[in-house]
A protein has these predicted regions:
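Long, compositionally biased
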Residues: 5-15, 68-101, 155
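N-terminal interaction modules that seed assembly of large macromolecular complexes
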Residues: 19-83
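A general marker of short, structured functional hotspots
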Residues: 28, 82, 104, 124, ...
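Alpha-helix capping and helix-coil boundary motifs
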Residues: 47, 74, 119-123, 146-147
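Alpha-helix initiation/capping motif
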Residues: 56, 86-87, 147
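Amphipathic protein-protein interaction modules
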Residues: 86-134
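Glycine-rich, aromatic-bearing surface loops/beta-hairpins
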Residues: 129-160
Length: 160
């Protein structure tokens, strides 16, 4: 018979990322952050990797910590503020309107949520730097439609 150990709430807090309002960061907060990363990449015609690399840990942390309030703000305003704050430059990549930025944000958030270790922000950076992201971002491959377990497996194998 399995022994059930009491849960030490103080230690759980150390395992979770806590937002600016002293609440755990949720999957919805992560979805918002990934959606804004995708929307930014489309607005400035650059890859998601460019956005993640340039907003760095600080920008990703900001999106996750304030997602509960930022989602009430106009998304384009959030993007405009981040473009100015992190000096994001326009590029030449033109992404199609479909799949939507929300759908791609959902694909990334589900993948990140499943593979996260201790540091959620570092996991975001690691996933966007993974070789499989080039496959996911090539919409002709339709990889973004694959079930999350397939993407998780590809992430751990470092190839699609």
């Amino acid at each position: 018979m399995k022994q059930i150990l009491p849960i030490d709430v103080a230690n759980i807090k150390e395992l979770l990322m806590i937002n600016a309002f002293d609440e755990p960061v949720t999957l919805n907060d992560l979805l918002f952050a990934c959606f804004i990363i995708e929307r930014l990449s489309r607005r400035i015609h650059r890859s998601n990797l460019y956005v993640v690399t340039n907003i760095k840990t600080e920008g990703i942390t900001y999106l996750l910590e304030f997602a509960t309030t930022l989602h009430s703000q106009n998304f384009n305003q959030t993007c405009d503020e981040m473009i100015l704050e992190y000096k994001l430059k326009n590029g030449k990549i033109v992404k199609p309107e479909k799949p939507s930025d929300l759908l791609i944000g959902n694909v990334y958030s589900e993948l990140i949520w499943k593979v996260q270790q201790e540091d959620l922000v570092q996991t975001v950076i690691d996933v966007y730097n993974s070789p499989i992201c080039k496959v996911i971002d090539n919409y002709k491959t339709l990889a973004y439609l694959d079930p999350t377990p397939v993407l998780v497996n590809a992430y751990y194998n470092k190839r699609y």
